[in-house]
Amino acid sequence: MPFPMEVLQASSLSFPLLRRHSRNNLINKFRNPTLPRIDIPRQNIDLKTFAATTPTVACPPSDPEIIPEKKEDKFDWYENWYPVATVCDLDKRRPHGRKVIGIDVVVWWDRKENAWKVFDDTCPHRLAPLSEGRIDQWGRLQCVYHGWCFDGVGACKFIPQAPHDGPPVETSKKACVKGVYPSCVRNGIVWFWPNSDPKYKDIYLTNKPHYIPELDDPSFTCTTITREVPYGYEILAENLMDPSHVPYAHYGILELEKVKESSKRDREGGHEMEISVGTIDVNGFSAKHVSADYYFVPPYVYYGRITPNAATKTKDATLPVVPEEKTAMIVFYCIPVTPGYSRLIYAGARNFAVQIDRFVPRWITHMSHNLIFDSDLFLLHVEEQKLKDLDWHKSCYIPTKADGQVVAFRRWLNKYGGTQVDWRNNFTPALPPTPSREQLFDRYWSHTAECSSCSVACKRLNALEIGLQAMSLVFVAMAAAVSAPATRYSMVAMAVLSFLASKWLSHFIHKTFYNHGYDHAFV
């Protein structure tokens, strides 16, 4: 999983720090820049500086300051907005099923109210999933098990099995959807409040999701990707806050910083870092690394604002990622799904090289993003499995200061978040067993199927593959029909080329949209 800075580079087309292994030449051609600026939500942040020396320092990270806990300072996991899906990946013609913090929800477009709605994904009749239904000709959400229909407030409007001259059974409260959640759209994302109590009906008026203006700024270009990963929220969040894994877990894919050859201690170029972590309280914390300021806004947002300045250079490395006088923003929405599974929505924006995104298809940029996800996916899954019965603070040896943000997150989680996500008896904390590597590295169900760009590209490339196979057969038939040797040889050559092209394309489709895998030993 990429640290914020690396994702900035992973989606860049021309920055010198971006690298790809030679076997990924296609990706190398289409890398796409990312990201913008954010208004800092907190002022007057008290920072304690970590002078981090990753390779050699043998002392533990300095403890960030923690504000003394007040009785009301416990974090409530269900008193917050949660991102459900990016609007660009939702189809208004059908309902969409998602699971967030253990809650199964259905997201659908109510054309009467011109708004996205989020319901509990359960029909009150026989508990069938509404997300498997359809939007009927009157714009109602229809359960396809028995045809019951619901409006935008969850009221039942039609029960086909009810007699015309009988009692209006559809007006009963028991016929209504049990969970109708407050929802809104902000920064191009559909959000929901995970409590259907009527007292929260107008919660948006007093409590809005965290807003990042740059993502809606027309002077910035913005790219997004959503990926479900086979490890939990805690592992996902701490990995995004860890810059020191980038040269190793993502070697050959990208570089976090440009390290001087004279300063390299190994091939990958791990080096000392300077990280500052601010005061930790129930509202999260801030940190500074090189020329970027980062903010953790519980429970889901971790974002960074990158603005080059004189402090960009360190004695061992430089960070020429963003042009002078320009700004880039990287935003991560970390969404708990179930124990052992989480979802990441990444949004990157920048106010330079904005024309590139207009010419590079979105699915091309997702190729490099997905490769980054894959490169440390297995490491993080196994790490979580090993930590499931252990105390993180006692089991992990943290001798250097490069892990400052990771330690800060774990301290926040322990002090304010109850040590883990509150699943409210929906799940036990036990993790699911480890599936096969092929299932772990699945791209289709974890991304392609729910991505509007990649799903369309996958269908079109599959059609092209079939077309190439058909062309191969046509050329064979033409070769058999002609008598001129030169023409026959040409037809045979075209048949062979078409067949080989179809085989190559089949391999490309499989690795890009279905399953890629990753082997660090030969990178």
Swiss-Prot record:
It comes from Ocimum basilicum (Sweet basil). Residues 81-192 form the Rieske domain. Residues 1-50 form a transit peptide. One of its GO terms (cellular component) is cytoplasm. [2Fe-2S] cluster binds at C123, H125, C143, H146. GO terms for molecular function: 2 iron, 2 sulfur cluster binding; chlorophyllide a oxygenase activity; metal ion binding; monooxygenase activity. GO terms for biological process: flavonoid metabolic process. Keywords: 2Fe-2S, Chloroplast, Cytoplasm, Iron, Iron-sulfur, Membrane, Metal-binding, Oxidoreductase, Plastid, Transit peptide, Transmembrane, Transmembrane helix. Glandular trichome-specific expression in leaves. This is Flavonoid 8-hydroxylase 1, chloroplastic. Pathway: Flavonoid metabolism. Rieske-type, PAO-family oxygenase involved in the biosynthesis of polymethoxylated flavonoids natural products such as nevadensin and salvigenin, aroma compounds which contribute to the flavor of sweet basil, and exhibit pharmacological activities such as anti-allergic, anti-oxidant, antibacterial, anti-proliferative, and anti-inflammatory effects. Catalyzes the 8-hydroxylation of salvigenin (SALV) to produce 8-hydroxysalvigenin (8-OH-SALV). Can also use cirsimaritin (CIRM) as substrate with low efficiency.
